[in-house]
Amino acid sequence: MTILLDRKTAVLVQGITGKIGSFHAKEMMDYGTNVVGGVTPGKGGTSEHGVPVFDTMKEAVEKTGATASIVFVPPPFAADSIMEAADAGIRTCVAITDGIPAQDMIKVKRYMRRYRAENRMCLIGPNCAGIISPSKALLGIMPGNIYLSGHVGIVGRSGTLGYEAAAQMKELGIGVSTSVGIGGDPINGSSFKDILELFEADPETHAVVMIGEIGGPQEAEAAEYIRDHMKKPVIAYVAGLSAPKGRKMGHAGAIISAFGESASEKVEILREVGVAIAPTPAEIGITAQRVLKAA
């Protein structure tokens, strides 16, 4: 079993006729993802990589029965695309787009609260790598060849550090159930806590690797959830131990602005609740191996 995505999940690509959307749609299809169509306003009635293109998400969902979508839409229009997906009945939406204005994401978050919690779309991102369930399906931009199918979940703000963790674990023969990149923006759809809840409920996930970074309260909130609810072992790496306060480091959300937002403070908070800490990026894999052997 995987979380959020399996080989049967019917996927729509929003922005499929653009250069980036078209490229990654093909990559996902080649990996085995069940891409059933795409959406580009004004391009309805055409096709891309053998799947139909629709003008609206509503029409696309009605015609294909899709339950998931991925957004490759320029920043000025991405928020509208996310809200359109929610209104069309999409259950899981991955927003790859980087540079969506914070004000637009506040609008998206407020808009999605109109729906009851049980009917609310799960938004992953924006500015994220997406989701991969190895050997089953890819809903994102990850390099599928570095993932081995297995029983360790990965969740991280940094896509590339998620790749690094997966590659190290593959070399050690440790497989991944699902990997989720939640994105590095200060306002995003799903938090560490949201994804940890899904992994804790998944019988095929035996442990979780969590990759955090400086800035924001997400790691502290995750630590509280781990302390109170998680029975599965958690391994963590927090990027930015040498980052100076007040300077943005890569992601828009990677900036230390308050107590508890530095990497060292986050490491201490996580260690206090029993999380195994990888001291460097190069040691994520061996830390996971050590924890799994002890479990």
Protein language model features and the residues they cover:
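Catalytic-core regions of core metabolic enzymes
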Residues: M1-A295
